[in-house]
Amino acid sequence: MSKIEKLIKVLCPNGIIFKTIGEICETITDYVAAGSFKDLSNNVKYLKEPDYAMLIRTTDIKSNFKGDKFIYINEAAFNYLWRVNLDKESIVLPNIGNCGEVYYLTPNDLPYKRCALATNSILVRSKQVNMKYLKHIFLAKDFQTQLKKIISHSGQTKFNKTDLKKLKIPVPPLEVQEEIVRILDKFGELEAELEAELEARKSQYEFWRDKLFEQNVKEKYIFEDILKSLKTGLNPRKFFKVNTVDAVNYYVTVKELGERNVRYWESKDKINSEGLQRINERSNLEVNDVLFSGTGTIGKVSLIEKEPKNWNVKEGVYILKPKKEKVIPTYLMYLMRSNYMKKLYSDYIVGSPVSSIPMKELKKIKISLPSLQEQERIVNILDKFDKLVNDISEGLPAEIEARRKQYEYYRNKLLSFEELVVNG
């Protein structure tokens, strides 16, 4: 018998009390609780430069505060937003977009001395239950099933505080909560160690990749001279519509360009056969084409390794068709990912707020290109690194995924309780 089973047998043999979120959480609030939209606009000004406090978005938390495009606020705004000051142990639930995600934060996790929660999220705190237990409960299958029932799918997914307060969760004695947290946190620690190792391997991979591309190669080419063509996809406009009744093919955007392959099945938008044909008249997608995001998030790269039968791309995703007598397709993919290439095309990026690199400018870039034999040697080296850091079927990503599934299994098992039935 496990320690948890023994504790339950002694402390609550007849079952676990279930309570609503509203009953156990003293704080269930958000950014807009401070006042009307007009008052918020008057009292809170977003600043690009560091100031008194930082406004924390879920995108910042998700990226582990990497990057430099943070939002800051002055002292008056921070005090105005006192309800969502992140000065204590907190749980953050996105409630507009990304519903179902759960973030546990302490002040030590944050990159700035004073922080407040931004829009589109709910801040939850409880003095009655262990906050880490609450985090695990919110991630568990039973709670997520309840949450799905209160999520609206008109436009962006969303739910409100009022409905959240009504959801029920098991509240075992604190000793049981603490033992559950101890067990589940071990999985989290192991996953964090693996992710840290993966980050180190990625840095190593990027270092050697860039070193290989920055070799002093005498042979120089104008970029368009190593390509058969440089094309792009097509936007709906008057040509076709997305998500029609007969739409069964995937309409791929920059978001679906993966580390190597195109994750076309993740696209939210679909097109019918006529739309697919119209796009392909322009894009002419084929195996060994390299896809490059030339607008918006510039620099995402994928290689087409299987015939693209049921998907095509939007305008802004560039299709690079390599001349195989000049460049190996896989080498071209790695080249487009490299910092060497990014430095070459960054001077030609235009536009704000949506940036892009014009195809005519990309064609003009002068690059160093080794022999096909040397390209093959470089590809073999980088393929090994790529498998280690990006392949979800083997290497570190596969190990991380296995640990995550193990955590989810034990979390759902440990957090499934028999409810105490109170008669009368």
Task: Please annotate each region the language model reported.
Residues 1-11, 413, 423-424:
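Accessory (non-catalytic) regions of SAM-dependent nucleic-acid methyltransferases
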Residues 1-2, 13-19, 134, 165-206, ...:
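Amphipathic alpha-helical segments
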Residues 10-39, 211-235, 399, 405, ...:
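Non-catalytic DNA-recognition/assembly elements of restriction-modification systems
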Residues 16, 21, 25, 53, ...:
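Short, structured motif recognition centered on aromatic/hydrophobic residues
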Residues 26-45, 59-88, 226-241, 255-287:
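Sequence-specific dsDNA recognition surfaces
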Residues 57-58, 75-139, 253, 274-276, ...:
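A short beta-sheet element
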Residues 112-115, 198-214, 244, 309-313, ...:
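Short amphipathic alpha-helical linker/capping segments at the junctions of internal repeats
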Residues 113-121, 152-172, 310-318, 350-371:
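A short glycine-rich beta-alpha junction/loop motif
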